[in-house]
């Protein structure tokens, strides 16, 4: 009985898979055109995956990490950045030509103000596969601020002084208080 149930289960799974495979389509090649039989040819795959500038959504905080008092709308922007594969493991896809682009972004200070302003971002216009640089990690002479909550702190590499990424005004905007020991926004003590 168990064998029969198992066989029926696997047969149904196979039929479902084959039905889905029949209707699924390969990625479009150019201008939304599809290849016959849903197979993307090798040279097309190779050309589209090789190192080149490609539109990438980039988080604004990644580009402006010090502007933590603002909330940005939208929170990420479409930028041309180098991406793709190189033909050798010893190579990496890097920009060889860059330019700036200015975009209008809404900056919101919670419960205070909001305005649309211009922000500049770096775009890659040309990319090449170049030998990977050997990255030696610099000797860090500072003790970490907190092992468990590194993401809440900023550390000055010269003085080793730890400070909170959160600000008192950011916590107060959410009706909370900044706990300077943990760098978290906590409920006010009564």
UniProtKB/Swiss-Prot annotation:
| Family matches, as PROSITE patterns | PDGF_1 (PS00249), PDGF_2 (PS50278)
- UniProt-recorded Gene Ontology molecular function terms: chemoattractant activity; growth factor activity; heparin binding; vascular endothelial growth factor receptor binding
Q: Mind listing the UniProt keywords for this protein, alphabetically? A: Angiogenesis, Developmental protein, Differentiation, Disulfide bond, Glycoprotein, Growth factor, Heparin-binding, Mitogen, Secreted, Signal
Q: Where in the cell is it found?
A: Secreted
Predominant location category:
secreted
Q: InterPro entries annotated for this entry?
A: Cystine-knot_cytokine, PD_growth_factor_CS, PDGF/VEGF_dom, PDGF/VEGF_growth_factor, VEGF_C, VEGF_C_sf
Cysteine-cysteine disulfides: 51-93, 82-127, 86-129
Glycosylation site positions: 100
Sorted alphabetically, the Gene Ontology cellular component annotations on this record are:
extracellular space; membrane
Which Gene3D superfamilies does UniProt cross-reference here? Answer: Cystine-knot cytokines, Vascular endothelial growth factor, heparin-binding domain
The residues forming the signal peptide are 1-26
Q: Which family does it belong to?
A: Belongs to the PDGF/VEGF growth factor family.
How is the quaternary structure described? Homodimer; disulfide-linked. Also found as heterodimer with PGF. Interacts with NRP1. Interacts with isoform 2 of BSG. Interacts with CD82; this interaction inhibits VEGFA-mediated signaling pathway.
Record's protein name: Vascular endothelial growth factor A
UniProt organism field: Mesocricetus auratus
Which gene underlies this protein? VEGFA
């Amino acid at each position: 009985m168990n064998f029969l149930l198992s066989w029926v289960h696997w047969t149904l799974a196979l039929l479902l898979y084959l039905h889905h495979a029949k209707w699924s389509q390969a990625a479009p090649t150019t201008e939304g055109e599809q290849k016959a039989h849903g197979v993307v040819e090798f040279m097309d795959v190779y050309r589209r995956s090789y190192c080149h500038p490609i539109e990438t959504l980039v988080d604004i905080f990644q580009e402006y990490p010090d502007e933590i008092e603002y909330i940005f709308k939208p929170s990420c922007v479409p930028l041309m950045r180098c991406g793709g594969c190189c033909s050798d493991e010893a190579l990496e896809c890097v920009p060889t030509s860059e330019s700036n682009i200015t975009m209008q972004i809404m900056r919101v200070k919670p419960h205070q103000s909001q305005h649309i302003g211009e922000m500049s971002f770096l775009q890659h216009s040309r990319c090449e596969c170049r030998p990977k640089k050997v990255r030696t990690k610099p000797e860090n002479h500072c003790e970490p601020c907190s092992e468990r909550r590194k993401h809440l702190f900023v550390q000055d590499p010269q003085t080793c002084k730890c400070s909170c990424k959160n600000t008192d005004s950011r916590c107060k905007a959410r009706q909370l208080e900044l706990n300077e020991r943990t760098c978290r926004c906590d409920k006010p003590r009564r």
